[in-house]
Structures are given as structure tokens and as C-alpha cells.
């Protein structure tokens, strides 16, 4: 069992914000709650433009995810831990099929990466 199920996901994509937002809604069968907020039966996702995004830094090293254009803040609700982790892995698989890069940062990242 993990003490904290909060999850941050960095996303590297050329998609504009609206396309990424729509993709996320489709990937998780979510509902738009606010301009940058998606809700589902199992989680809430805040979709953020990364304030640290830096084109020059990105061009120097596109693998440095701290400078990617977007990130997601994900909080679980009303779900068992094991199912939540599976759902996160499914979300990341969906994103990896459409984005240049996806990096997860959380207490259970090794478990998620092992499922993909």
C-alpha cells in the first residue's frame, strides 16, 4: 500500500492544449469540469501548461521532461489502489500512442511502468 496516490505526469507533444484536453477526455472517459479540469469516476485530472516550458532548453535536450509543455496532476477518488494504478497505466499507454513522450512521477511509478 502506498501512502500517497497523487500522480504527476509530464507530457511531450506538439498538440495544442485543446487537442490534448480532448484526447485525455477520450482516453479516460472523462467529463470536462472546468477549463483545465477533468473528472471521472476514479480520478480528477488538472491539465496544466508547464510554466517551466522553455523552447531553448527543450531544443538543447528534449529528454528533460521538466521543460516539457504540459503536465497533469492526478488525484484518485472512490477506487481501490490496485485498480487506480492499472487505470493510470492505461492512461499512460493511451498518451504514449499519441505523444512524443510521457513521464510519470509518483510513489508507484515503477509499478505503473512495469505494466506497460
Predicted stretch roles:
Residues 16-17, 42, 110-112:
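Short, catalytically relevant binding-site loops at active-site mouths
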Residues 1-4, 65-67, 71, 78-82, ...:
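N-terminal low-complexity, intrinsically disordered segments
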Residues 1-30:
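Short, extreme N-terminal segment that most often corresponds to the first beta-strand
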Residues 86-116:
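Acidic, proline/glycine-rich low-complexity IDRs
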Residues 10-15, 75-78, 107-108:
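Structural motif
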Residues 25-34, 92-100:
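A common structural junction motif
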Residues 16, 20, 80-87:
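Short amphipathic alpha-helical segments
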Residues 31-80:
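Short, intrinsically disordered low-complexity segments
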